[in-house]
């Protein structure tokens, strides 16, 4: 996010950030996870209803405000994956964003779509960012919704073994305009700063009383 900057409509620069879908909730528990056949059936079912689910998520109008103490935190988003190996693709969150852009362009003429292509207009993001999957071993601790520091568990037990928790984090790039201010902002009139912001995601954690449970924690999700 670009702090203390001119309105984007005045500088014609498109910023990038994470989309949040408050209607997206984790359902079920670890006991519902089965073997490979169960996973295959689950993926098939998801594929059959993928478009319908996306439409519902995009139509979700509920807004959940972060607490005043966590004013740098965004809404809930899904950036957590349980896997035996490092995920090769970004999470569903980014697929939803791409699909929304497709829907927005579907009602445009070909001529308008051509001119709406950022590459044709020479648009750049206001702030440069980097995204990558990180493990709980790299995070170690995080802040939950109550402001308490909790330990992020590296592995999640399942009926047939253990899976690692992976978090898809996005933060401001250490190179480029991060130190010089936001791209496209006239430095003669405005002071600006690229700053990493956070969102809440659900993860398996342990508090200082050794109680293990699923809690919403803050991770880096946009710049």
Curated annotation (Swiss-Prot):
SUPFAM superfamilies, per database record: Cystine-knot cytokines
GO cellular component, one term: axon
Propeptide: 6-114
Main location, first listed in the record: secreted
Pfam families cross-referenced by the UniProt entry: NGF
GO BP annotations listed: cell surface receptor protein tyrosine kinase signaling pathway; modulation of chemical synaptic transmission; negative regulation of neuron apoptotic process; nerve development; nerve growth factor signaling pathway; neuron projection morphogenesis
Annotated keywords: Cleavage on pair of basic residues, Disulfide bond, Glycoprotein, Growth factor, Secreted, Signal
Signal sequence annotation: 1-5
InterPro entries linked to this entry: Brain-der_neurotrophic_factor, Cystine-knot_cytokine, Nerve_growth_factor-like, Nerve_growth_factor-rel, Nerve_growth_factor_CS
Localization in the cell: Secreted
Keyword Secreted: yes
Superkingdom of origin organism: Eukaryota
Molecular-function annotations in GO: growth factor activity; nerve growth factor receptor binding
Cysteine disulfide partners in this protein: 127-194, 172-223
Glycosylation sites: 107
Protein purpose: Promotes the survival of neuronal populations that are all located either in the central nervous system or directly connected to it.
Family: Belongs to the NGF-beta family.
Record-given protein name: Neurotrophic factor BDNF precursor form
Gene source species: Calabaria reinhardtii (Calabar boa)
Phylogenetic placement of the source organism: Eukaryota, Metazoa, Chordata, Craniata, Vertebrata
């Amino acid at each position: 996010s670009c702090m203390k900057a001119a309105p984007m409509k005045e500088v014609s620069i498109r910023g990038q950030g994470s989309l949040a879908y408050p209607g997206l909730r984790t359902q079920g528990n670890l006991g519902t996870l089965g073997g490979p056949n169960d996973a295959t059936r689950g993926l098939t079912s998801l594929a059959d209803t993928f478009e319908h689910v996306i439409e519902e998520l995009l139509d979700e109008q509920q807004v959940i405000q972060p607490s005043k103490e966590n004013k740098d935190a965004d809404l809930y988003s899904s950036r957590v994956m349980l896997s035996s190996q490092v995920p090769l693709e970004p999470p569903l969150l980014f697929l939803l964003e791409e699909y929304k852009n497709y829907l927005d362009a579907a009602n445009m003429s070909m001529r308008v779509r051509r001119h709406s292509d950022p590459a044709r207009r020479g648009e750049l993001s206001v702030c440069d960012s980097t995204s990558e999957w990180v493990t709980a071993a790299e995070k170690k601790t995080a802040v939950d919704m109550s402001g308490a520091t909790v330990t992020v568990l590296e592995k999640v037990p399942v009926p047939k073994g253990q899976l690692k928790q992976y978090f898809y984090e996005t933060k401001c790039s250490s190179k480029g305009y991060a130190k010089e201010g936001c791209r496209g902002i006239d430095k003669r009139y405005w002071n600006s700063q690229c700053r990493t912001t956070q969102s809440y995601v659900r993860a398996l954690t342990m508090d200082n009383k050794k109680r293990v449970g699923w809690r919403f924690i803050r991770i880096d999700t946009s710049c």
